[in-house]
From Swiss-Prot:
Matching SUPFAM superfamilies: a domain/subunit of cytochrome bc1 complex (Ubiquinol-cytochrome c reductase), Transmembrane di-heme cytochromes
GO annotation, biological process: mitochondrial electron transport, ubiquinol to cytochrome c
Residues given in the record as heme b b566 binding sites: 97, 196
Species annotation: Microtus socialis
InterPro entries to which the protein is assigned, alphabetical: Cyt_b/b6_C, Cyt_b/b6_C_sf, Cyt_b/b6_N, Cytb/b6-like_sf, Cytochrome_b, Cytochrome_b_C_euk/bac, Cytochrome_b_N_euk/bac, Di-haem_cyt_TM
Annotated positions binding a ubiquinone: 201
UniProt-recorded name of the protein: Cytochrome b
Localization of this protein: Mitochondrion inner membrane
Pfam families xrefs: Cytochrom_B_C (PF00032), Cytochrome_B (PF00033)
Miscellaneous notes: Heme 1 (or BL or b562) is low-potential and absorbs at about 562 nm, and heme 2 (or BH or b566) is high-potential and absorbs at about 566 nm.
Keyword Thylakoid: no
Length: 380
């Protein structure tokens, strides 16, 4: 078996990636989220495939087909809720994975980090288009509002929006193409994940100290396969509790009303995992400015390696920057809350303050804290 594992051209790749891979001996449970994201992607592709067998991407029948899946298809309700809540679990793991990367300075592996940002954009695009497919009120109006943001692009904006819509409003053509893209994107994401892993295995994993761990490596299997499996069990348990006991807790009640272009919901808002970006978008009174801030809220991650001023890689031994980091986490939670609130006092001013704080912490305060720590630790 050992000979096949090490000699067979295909199994050899798997062996070098998941079995005989040299891994740092001290990586914590924060390093579990990569494998959990892989599991989430598999769950989403499988449940999505079964949903696609019964779904029809036509404005006249889309809502009814989802109802049919829940009522008439064997375990259709389970597949539908697994897919909907699987997206939430996916984003929880994604945010924790990115947060881990920022905390431990993993962004210094630039190729891996940038590939991760591309993956984040791809997953966000997939989730947005998936939310449109049930063709409920929030599906329709969410699609209308978010695609309309492109009209802020000077000169070509309006033409671009109508080109994406396939007409003069969100209609049958829009739904059909969103379904096509929503179906193909997870497979593109799978390919990007392999590239992400390829880049990661060029440098090897980071570790909680941020120090070089070449002198102390252990094989990935059995140590981290067992450790990852525990993470998988915890995730699946949380996932099934969410899906079976609280399936609608993260959804919007408006999406149980069929799409009606003549009736606007009182509060148009995206799914919870986009609320932080939506709050940043809304905090700027100018349309183009809001769109740029929205994009920048994610793109700013690509500048993390340039903004790294500390002589140390991780935040493990840097209490001042640690404080900034946890304020940033709290700020993101505030933005998420504000994104779900109506546009009125005091939510407007809270959202604007939190948006300014978000960019200030990342661009100014954390780099300054890094330089200050170098100074007081005499690391210059």
């Amino acid at each position: 078996m050992t000979i096949i594992r090490k000699k067979h051209p295909l199994i050899k790749i798997i062996n070098h990636s998941f079995i005989d891979l040299p891994a740092p001996s001290n990586i914590s449970s924060w390093w579990n989220f990569g494998s959990l994201l892989g599991l989430c992607l598999i769950i989403q592709i499988l449940t999505g495939l079964f949903l696609a067998m019964h779904y029809t991407s036509d404005t006249a029948t889309a809502f009814s087909s989802v109802t049919h899946i829940c009522r008439d298809v064997n375990y259709g309700w389970l597949i539908r809720y697994m897919h909907a809540n699987g997206a939430s679990m996916f984003f929880i793991c994604l945010f924790l994975h990115v947060g881990r990367g920022i905390y431990y300075g993993s962004y210094n592996m630039i190729e891996t980090w940038n590939m991760g940002i591309v993956l984040l954009f791809a997953v966000m695009a997939t989730a947005f288009m998936g939310y449109v497919l049930p063709w409920g009120q929030m599906s329709f109006w969410g699609a209308t509002v978010i695609t309309n943001l492109l009209s802020a692009i000077p000169y070509i904006g309006t033409t671009l929006v109508e080109w994406i819509w396939g007409g003069f409003s969100v209609d049958k053509a829009t739904l059909t193409r969103f379904f096509a893209f929503h179906f193909i994107l997870p497979f593109i994401i799978t390919a990007l994940v392999l590239v992400h892993l390829l880049f990661l295995h060029e440098t090897g994993s980071n570790n909680p100290t941020g120090l070089n761990s070449d002198a102390d490596k252990i094989p990935f299997h059995p140590y981290y396969t067992i450790k990852d499996f525990l993470g998988v069990l915890i995730l699946l348990m949380a996932f099934m509790i969410l899906t079976l006991f609280f399936p609608d807790i993260l959804g919007d009640p408006d999406n149980y009303t069929p799409a009606n272009p003549l009736n606007t919901p009182p509060h148009i808002k995206p799914e919870w995992y986009f609320l932080f970006a939506y709050a940043i978008l809304r905090s700027i009174p100018n349309k183009l400015g809001g769109v740029l801030a929205l994009i920048l809220s994610i793109v700013i991650l690509a500048f993390m390696p340039l903004l790294h001023t500390s002589k140390q890689r991780a935040l493990t031994f840097r209490p001042i920057t640690q404080t900034m980091y946890w304020i940033l986490v709290a700020d993101l939670l505030i933005l998420t809350w504000i994104g779900g609130q109506p546009v009125e006092y005091p939510f407007i001013i809270i959202g604007q303050t939190a948006s300014i704080a978000y960019f200030t912490i990342i661009v100014i305060l954390m780099p300054m804290a890094g330089m200050f720590e170098n100074n007081i630790l005499d690391l210059d």
